[in-house]
Amino acid sequence: MYSKTIIPFVCYSLFFVVSAYANPDSAVIQGGQGTTGASNSHAAEAASAIALQPQPPAAPEETGIRYNWRRDKYAENSVDTNVILSEHPANPPKPAAIAPENAVPWEHMPNKSYLIPALEVTGALGLLSVYDRVVYPNQMQDGKKVYSSNFTSTWDHMRKQNWVFDQDPFNINQFAHPYQGATMYGLARSSGLGFWESLAYSNAGSFLWKMAGETDPPSINDQITTGNAGSLLGEALFRMAELVLNDGGSKPDAWHEAGAAIISPPTAFNRTAFGDRYKTIYPSLNPATFWDFQLGSILSSSTQTAATMNFAMSYGLPGKPGYTYTRPMDYFDFEISTQASSSNPVNNVLLRGLLYGKEYHAGNDYRGIWGLYGSYDYLSPAAFRVSTTALSLGTTAQCWVGPGIALQGSLLGGVGFGAAGTTPVAEGERDYHYGVAPQGLLALRLLFGNRAALELDARGYYVTGSGQFNSLSTSSNPVDSAGGSETIIRIKSGFNVRVYGRHGLGLQYVESTRDSQYGTQPNRHQRDGTVSIVYTFGGSSHFGAVEWRDNVNQ
């Protein structure tokens, strides 16, 4: 079963290497009518909206201008003020981004299919069942082999609907299962379906597995994390894979196809299995993005020094002229952190995205979005851990606070379903708690031009309710205690400085605390502090400040 965690971990690690392909900033957003052409098929009509367009020549650098690092600005002396030029060195011509009013909605693309992903999800679950029967033939629970399901066990599950909180390890329930859900989601999404339709497929696939894939009772926690957290993760991976493909032009080469395949295998499967049917690249509408890759060493208060590898991406940062937030996850923030540890290879996976919201502004220096966010958090320090799937109300914004200095931030508050507890000291021991999880987030980034960035990220979780298996639990008699709660707070501060080009150095400190109260058990306080020194390789947008003002250099 542990291989279910190792496999996605390896995929994510490889993803770090190919993520450098994602560079949408070299395209331009044009506010006029898109180019269309006649075609004998609907597929050609949709593809004709993407046309190769040479970039305008870069404006000569003006002497005396101190802040020419900004990624995008309005073209000076241009009749069309909707054209945004990139200040990066010119690259070979790539497809022009599609104006929002001219983009063909993904769910209206030709060759959309509901049958294909239904068959694919069923087939994938069938292959997983065969794998589990071969690799784990003698895994037992409640006197039954877990992976010996048949028509009788399936009918019993369908008839009784005896849903419980299961006893699987934390990393399986909270990390491997969401990745499984992301795979089912990706099969539907890359078949032309929209976000909500694909979410339904992921939830249906999770329900099918709970009914027919195992003999143990179906679990509430798996249905929530696999179907819903998996959908959020699947959408983020789908969007990032499509950025890689978009960077390769109208016909991505083998390297771009391979990079996208590592990020989102189901997307690559449909692109390969069905020829040109699903070759259309998702109309991302040229979002403002920021990403960086970090490699270094961490020193924890509870563990020894270990190597660490991190990747973070912000997609659809507010303030980009011409970009709109009409689709779920048109803005999201994704982060994954790993370390060289066989017992705890994944430190955290953090994802939040705007499901429904609006843009707003205040004056000429402030741009933001607000609305309903979905989030999936997985935090696993050495001594304890927490994971939640939640809905929150909040805002994300950027403000120019001085010449060349920008403040970006997010403020969210909401509630979800979570799991929290200590890290077992022995394999097979299980001590974590399920319940309702109110939570909050404050994330700030102060950007000093393209030279340095100061970051602060504070998160709080309060997990209370049922689902805590205490020391009296056994595999045949789980003791589910309704009383108890946990408060977990995590604060991360960091400073990154660019040394040369896209290369930089960073220093980071993370402080995590846990306070638990369970019935007659003594209250417990734990803390974990981690210091990291990292090498940073960043994207072409440097630290990600978005420029929308047309008189910045005047």
Task: Label every model-predicted segment.
Residues 180-181, 213-242:
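Alpha-helical transmembrane segments that form the membrane-embedded catalytic/substrate-binding core
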Residues 194-215, 227, 231:
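Small-polar-interrupted transmembrane alpha-helices in polytopic inner-membrane proteins
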Residues 482, 486-554:
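Predominantly the C-terminal beta-signal and adjacent terminal strand-loop region
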